[in-house]
A protein has these predicted regions:
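A residue-level marker of the well-folded mature domains of exported/periplasmic proteins
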Residues: 1-114
């Protein structure tokens, strides 16, 4: 539906969705927020292989390098300034200086501050 709307830009979610945003000679995807899972999957598979896997619910965060966004030239339509600001915010998330609202940490949209 977004492709059919005129002048619309979107941000993809979970994986790089740039290819999905192709719309004639333009693209509606500015960037995509990513779940970065390759390291986690690799580590868990090694735990299974060596017998140390203990199974548990784990919440991965920026501090685990489990989140990110597409900034690769040609797949991202953000300005250099926007990318710099997102990188700065990502660093604050990793340091715990920004704690986003979530259903597991008691922070709500109403109580969120930074």
């Amino acid at each position: 539906a977004a492709k059919e709307a005129e002048g619309v830009k979107v941000i993809g979610c979970d994986v790089d969705q740039y290819d999905d945003g192709a719309n004639g000679d333009s693209n509606i995807v500015l960037t995509s927020g990513l779940k970065v899972m390759h390291d986690t999957v690799y580590n868990v598979l090694n735990e299974v292989k060596d017998g140390s896997f203990k199974g548990a619910n784990v919440t991965l965060t920026a501090a685990d390098d489990a989140t990110g966004f597409v900034s690769e030239e040609g797949r991202c339509q953000l300005t250099a300034e926007a990318i710099e600001k997102i990188n700065a915010a990502q660093a604050l998330l990793k340091e715990g200086k920004i704690v986003p609202a979530a259903n597991f940490n008691g922070v709500t949209p109403e109580t969120f501050t930074w």
